[in-house]
Swiss-Prot record:
It is an enzyme of class 4 (lyase). GO terms for biological process: melanin biosynthetic process. GO terms for cellular component: cytoplasm; extracellular space. The keyword Cell membrane does not apply. This is D-dopachrome decarboxylase. It is found in: Cytoplasm. The modification N-acetylproline is found at residue 2. Homotrimer. Transmembrane segments: none annotated. Tautomerization of D-dopachrome with decarboxylation to give 5,6-dihydroxyindole (DHI). The keyword Acetylation applies. Keywords: Acetylation, Cytoplasm, Lyase, Melanin biosynthesis. Its EC number is 4.1.1.84.
Amino acid sequence: MPFVELDTSLPAGRVPAGLEKRLCAATAAILSKPEDRVNVTVRSGLAMVVNGSAEPSAQLLVSSIGVVGTAEENRGHSARFFEFLTKELDLAEDRIMIRFFPLERWQIGKKGTVMTFL
């Protein structure tokens, strides 16, 4: 059950319409997870500094069970997320940062319990 949060300093008018759905589909493909398990949030117009600069930028946070826990996995994921984000947001790679957080089943609540018991 991946959780993906995209924060960007781009104003809402510069964020392509439907980006959240395309990011959901891309995340499912990149992480080999069913699209109906992917959760996406897109926040635009934020005051941000990336690499010491306030030029337009984005930060992606990817949290998931079992697929973001190694450097080897994340190197491949990073390449594919960067390809998607640079195209969609028209930002250079040095204006985008990605953070990967592995989750355990007990850290995700759903249906009044945690994923461990579902």
